[in-house]
């Protein structure tokens, strides 16, 4: 007995159908979706700066460090700085005050508190802000942040001579915390505006 021959066309169609079914089921599987997501992530030119750099991740990391060691004033200060950059002045003040309570009298922390208060008051020098600056400068007459805040406020009030004097003092300190190029530009701008007033 001869077995019936399956036509070649039918065999080809069945083979193609099988291939499509296999590929289709693979493409619908979760494994393929994970591979595809990873491929797209790798193609993103910013993939190296992924989620660990997001503000939420930074905040979570800082909070985890503080939970692990709540007596670390440095981490509290970093938390204050984080909130300042997020324009969350209330939480920034709380964090900086906690850092100050843990560390004790500290010029940098008083200057940081002054900065938060200054921006919270829409860049106006309040009595409370001035008190924090005075405390910072009493502890360290060369405290960069306090001097820069005074210079910026003088500039905002069109007291260009005072701004130039303070910025020059900061420049003469040769601190690595200072962007000298930006400082020179600020001094030159103040000089230009001063000449216009004269």
Curated annotation (Swiss-Prot):
UniProt TPR repeat ranges: 73-106, 144-177
UniProt KW keywords: Repeat, TPR repeat
Keyword match Repeat: yes
Keyword match Repeat: yes
SMART domains: TPR
Pfam family, one: TPR_CcmH_CycH
Knockout or disruption consequences: Triple nrfE-nrfF-nrfG deletion mutants no longer attach heme 1 (covalently attached to 'Cys-122', the CWSCK motif) of cytochrome c552 (AC P0ABK9).
Name the record gives this protein: Formate-dependent nitrite reductase complex subunit NrfG
Primary gene name: nrfG
InterPro entries: C-type_cytochrome_biogenesis (IPR051263), TPR-like_helical_dom_sf (IPR011990), TPR_CcmH_CycH (IPR056413), TPR_rpt (IPR019734)
Organism of provenance: Escherichia coli (strain K12)
Annotated PANTHER family: CYTOCHROME C-TYPE BIOGENESIS PROTEIN CCMH, CYTOCHROME C-TYPE BIOGENESIS PROTEIN CYCH
Functional summary from the UniProt entry: Required for formate-dependent nitrite reduction. Not required for the biosynthesis of any of the c-type cytochromes nor for the secretion of the periplasmic cytochromes.
